[in-house]
Every structure is written in C-alpha cells, then in structure tokens.
C-alpha cells in the first residue's frame, strides 16, 4: 500500500507539472481527478480512550494496530491543557503509556490522539541556547530556527564496521587526566563519584579546557536552582556561545529526564555529521537509568538487579554507543564524558558496573581525597583510560608507570607515616615513595580556571620525580 501511495503521488506530481506546462493533452483524465481527490482528503487522526490511571501508568483502549512502542500521544482532558504521553507497553490488548508532564485534570474517558514520534529540528541556531528535551527554550528567548530535516531522537549507532578510528590525543586541560587517563578524539570516558565530591566542578574544568568546535551539555535530573549557576558561573558567555544545553530538572517526569539524554545525543550527532569535533558532557547517566527504572516499574516490568528492570541495561548501551567517531568520511567525532553517581560510594553497584564495561575508560573521584583538600579529587590508581597505550609517547609512558608505582607504595605506608610508626631505611622503595609522593600530589592539584596542557603536565611530573 505504501509503495502504491508513493506511485500515485509521483504520477500525480508528474501530471500536474505537465498540465501546468500545457502538455497535459493525451494524458488520462482520471489521473487528474484522482490526484485532485487525494489532495482534498483531510488526514484522519488515530485516537483512543483513556480507561485507567494508576501511578505513572495510563491505560488506553481503541488505538488499534497502528500504535507502537515509543509512539507519542496527545491526551485531551475534558478541561485543561493537553498532556503528552508515550506508549511504553501493551498488555491484554490495551496500551500503557507514561505521561511526559503532570496529569492533573486527566480522567478516564479522555481522548488520546496519536502524535508524531519524537524528532528534533536541530540547526546552528541552537548554539548558545538552553532548551528542554522537546526543543522548547528554557532561557526566555524565542524558539531557535528549525533545521531543514528533523532528526529522530531514538536512532541507532553508526554501524560498527563502518565507524572511523579514534582521532589524536585530546588535551583535557586537567593535569590528573592528561597524565593518568589520557583521551583521544571520539573516546567515551566515565566520571564515577558519589554525591558532593566534585563532579560538576570537574565538568566545568573540562568544558573550559577541551578544544572542541561544539559543546553539548545534557543535564539529566539536575537541581532547578543550579541551572543558572552552572550557565552563568561555570560556563560563561564565551563558552555558552558554542554550546547547546539540554536540561530536564529533577521535578520533570521520568520520560522527560530520559529524553534529555537522547535529545543531547541527537544534537551532538547533528554537529558531528557536519564534520565538527563535539564534546558531549552528560550529568548523569545514573539519573538516566533511574528514569528508565521508573518507567519500567510503572508498566510492571519485573525488577531484576537491585530494583532495576532488565530494559535499563538494554537501553544503556543503545545510548552510550551512539557517541564516538562518525562513519568513515564524516570527519567529525563525539568525545563524550559521562558522570556516574555511585550510590553509597559503591563502585560495583549495577549501573556503575554496566557503564564501566561499555565505555573506553573511567575516572574515579574519591571522597577521602576531596576531604584532604586536593582538587580535583581524582584517584589516579583506580582510574584508567583504555586508549592510554596508544596515546602516551615513548618517553611519557615510563614516567606515568613510575608515578603510579610511587603513589601505590605510598598508599600502603601512609597510615604508618601518619602515626609516626614508619622508620626510614628499612625499604628503599618505600623511602622513595614517602619522599616523592607529596610532590606528585602537588602536580595533581589544580584550581578551577587554572590552565594546563599535556606538555606542561608532563614537565611538572618530571620535576616532581627529580626532587631529592
């Protein structure tokens, strides 16, 4: 049927052009009549009825076979504004949807109309803007100009066999990362930390230190009061001009918080496909997973791992794999840094463990280091970049290995040093670590706004290792 409809549209367009040019003689007159009749038809909406409301789930009937998982609905209550919802499940011939906003005023019997699937008309006019996951401005300015072709927010990753290789080393502007967790263009890195350790501060440092054509921020479940603080204090007008901020605050519905991550990834893909180098900063993947858990439990999906339904661990790689280099010949890449909020400082909890296995490296922020006054509180012994062997030069690799060895040895004896029970002379390697580790720690300490690059970082490390 679809092919026939396309053929009719093609034939009718051809006959209209010929008719208008005065060459319609000899053509079948019934084609003209058919084309005119098709143009006069009004599109018919697919609609159903709300039959039940329970918690986050909305039960609907009458949508028929044209509705599918992921389709959007416009729910029309007897009074009040329409409510957007998304179909999340089918059960016993009924559809179950999750609202994208408050459902106050919605009641059984409300009309549900099938709406277009989510797509974003991204354009260069989005640069410098703060938007919600639907592309609606949050900065008080008019809506940005629409792109020529809207992009679907739920899109597959580029085919694995056709993706470009990772690019050259990318300077992050943070000494601890440039030394011990170096990154290449198109790499995906996780920032793992408990609450209140300094993830947001580190993200602000990265936003100011990484050389990128476009920066895309995904603020998923962010505190409402922190949005302007982040934009005005951490980002600033200069970096905002080349950035797109997608935000769904903590009071937004679960589908909106989930959609913030997909929308930000879609925006990043738009600029990557133009051949630009994109830095994607997402805070946080954990809140994305929590939104997925709310949706799954609302439609009665069984909890499997610490209350997380299986679909959560299916969606995580679908999102994270979209970042990285584009297809061969694209020229652009998405270098992505994802924060992971570990619950109770447990770095082996399910979301952290799953994300760590997907990404190309992980950086651990330690509360004890932060309490000791060293910022950023990166635990270099527990941090890893899987691309480090291909990034570090021949003269840099032994420096990093030696620094790691000294820090590891010092970690074993520092309690003895603090208690005054350590005796110099019993272990030469421990003596060296006790002497040099504080100098290495000073190299790792860096104030917010303090500039750095890999050459400066390795120069400072050489000087620290050379101290007597």
Task: Locate each region found by the language model.
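P-loop NTPase catalytic core
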Residues: 179-180, 186-468
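Acidic-enriched and Gly/Ser
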Residues: 26-32, 38-172
